[in-house]
């Protein structure tokens, strides 16, 4: 018996040695054959192949963004690193975000491979650890912080609340934006409660179970509807989501729909963080008909979240911007029967003579290149009379021509 135990211990020791000597790339970290680049202190607009930020900084040259490098001062929290969340983190990392805080308690499985970002060699790793390793290799300039726990439990909710309230780019400051990429209503309600309590703007996102539609919603506490203002039936009826799931049945998943939803999410997050363009309050996507609905949801005065009611009152108490409207001057028509304002003049009305322009006073030694001759009204009348007297009929002219 003791001999068998010794053999098992020897096998375990060999496996540990093999694991330690295995290339780090097998667990999602860059190996010596794939050296990560050095950190870059400042973003440069120099157009060279070795500059990873040249195409991003081109947004300044094209007057889309005033100061793109401000993105390095921003911190974003992503809750849920699945099909939408992992792609969202990937895009923000490539855009050069200053800090990413990732929340998830799940592991990478082989059934995740139909989605984007994760690779089969990362199966078994926690999603936040696998994501952090890959993202750090893509852009080592981004500060990445990971939290591997469920935010919906009582003890972990307080940790989540403290992290988004004090985990900003500057220590002790809140994050600039929270992105919800979770796949259940319980987690969405937890994020909603935290952001309402700390008055943080956040985006909610989701993909339908049939994988052919998705949406994003920008929630500004007090200004727009929170997730509890117009809850889905599962939330409103306090139904346990776990009772709805059946054994052997899973939700459908398409990387295309998730990629499109993540793209909408990051695009609007960038517009909000860098202050360009128009941020959509709600943007949906229906893949079957390529339909993209947009709308704005107003907050519910009878919302069940007491912090939402507080934020609504605070928003209503804010001074509204004064909009100065220019009063339009209405031009009344000159004639009641003429809606176009055309002035009618009688045929026998005397024609007004134009007032001759005054000759400017010239300095000494200066003269005008041309001076228009002055015409008096008497001269004009004499000219017209003479022209009338000299008029000859057509018959007389023809007779004169024949006699020549």
Curated annotation (Swiss-Prot):
Residues annotated as binding Zn(2+): 226, 229, 303, 308
UniProt cross-references to Pfam families, sorted A to Z: ThiF
Residue numbers binding ATP: 83, 104, 127, 150, 184
Region ranges (Disordered): 372-393
One record GO biological process: protein ufmylation
Alphabetical UniProt keywords: ATP-binding, Metal-binding, Nucleotide-binding, Ubl conjugation pathway, Zinc
Amino acid composition bias (Low complexity), ranges on this chain: 382-391
GO cellular component: cytosol
Catalytic machinery residues: 250 (glycyl thioester intermediate)
GO molecular function: ATP binding; metal ion binding; UFM1 activating enzyme activity
InterPro entries: D-isomer_DH_CS1, ThiF/MoeB/HesA, ThiF_NAD_FAD-bd, Ubiquitin-activating_enz
Its job: E1-like enzyme which activates UFM1.
Family designation: Belongs to the ubiquitin-activating E1 family. UBA5 subfamily.
PANTHER family: UBIQUITIN-ACTIVATING ENZYME E1, UBIQUITIN-LIKE MODIFIER-ACTIVATING ENZYME 5
Protein name as it appears in the record: Ubiquitin-like modifier-activating enzyme 5
Provenance organism: Drosophila simulans (Fruit fly)
């Amino acid at each position: 018996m003791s001999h068998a135990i010794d053999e098992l211990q020897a096998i375990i020791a060999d496996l540990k040695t093999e694991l330690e000597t295995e290339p780090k790339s097998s667990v999602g970290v860059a190996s010596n054959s794939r050296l990560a680049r050095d950190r870059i202190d400042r973003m440069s607009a120099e157009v060279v192949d070795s500059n990873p930020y040249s195409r991003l900084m081109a947004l300044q040259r094209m007057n889309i963004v005033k100061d793109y490098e401000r993105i390095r001062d921003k911190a974003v929290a992503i809750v849920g690193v699945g099909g939408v969340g992992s792609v969202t983190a990937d895009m923000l990392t490539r855009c050069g975000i200053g800090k990413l805080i990732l929340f998830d308690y799940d592991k990478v499985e082989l059934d995740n491979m139909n989605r984007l970002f994760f690779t089969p060699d990362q199966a078994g790793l926690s999603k936040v650890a696998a994501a952090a390793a890959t993202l750090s290799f893509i852009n080592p300039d981004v500060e990445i912080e990971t939290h591997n726990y469920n935010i919906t439990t009582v003890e972990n909710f307080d940790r989540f609340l403290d992290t988004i309230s004090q985990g900003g780019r500057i220590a002790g400051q809140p994050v600039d934006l929270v992105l919800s990429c979770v796949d259940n209503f319980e987690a969405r309600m937890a994020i909603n409660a935290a952001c309402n309590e700390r008055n943080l703007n956040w985006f909610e996102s989701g993909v339908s179970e049939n994988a052919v539609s998705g949406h994003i919603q920008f929630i500004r506490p007090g200004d727009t509807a929170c997730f509890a203002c117009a809850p889905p039936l599962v939330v409103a009826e306090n139904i346990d989501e776990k009772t709805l799931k059946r054994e052997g049945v899973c939700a459908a998943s398409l990387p295309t729909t998730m990629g499109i939803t993540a793209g909408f999410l990051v695009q609007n997050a960038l517009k909000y963080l860098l202050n360009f363009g128009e941020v959509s309050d709600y943007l949906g996507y229906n893949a079957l008909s390529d339909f993209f609905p947009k709308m704005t949801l107003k907050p519910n005065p009878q919302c069940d979240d007491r912090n939402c009611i507080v934020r609504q009152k605070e928003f209503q108490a804010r001074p509204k911007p004064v909009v100065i409207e220019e009063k339009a001057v209405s031009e009344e028509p000159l004639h009641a029967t003429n809606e176009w304002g055309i002035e009618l003049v009688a045929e026998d009305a005397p024609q007004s003579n134009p007032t001759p322009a005054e000759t400017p006073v010239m300095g000494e030694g200066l003269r005008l290149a041309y001076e228009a001759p002055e015409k008096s009204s008497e001269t004009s009348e004499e000219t017209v009379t003479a022209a009338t007297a000299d008029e000859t009929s057509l018959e007389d002219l023809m007779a004169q021509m024949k006699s020549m």
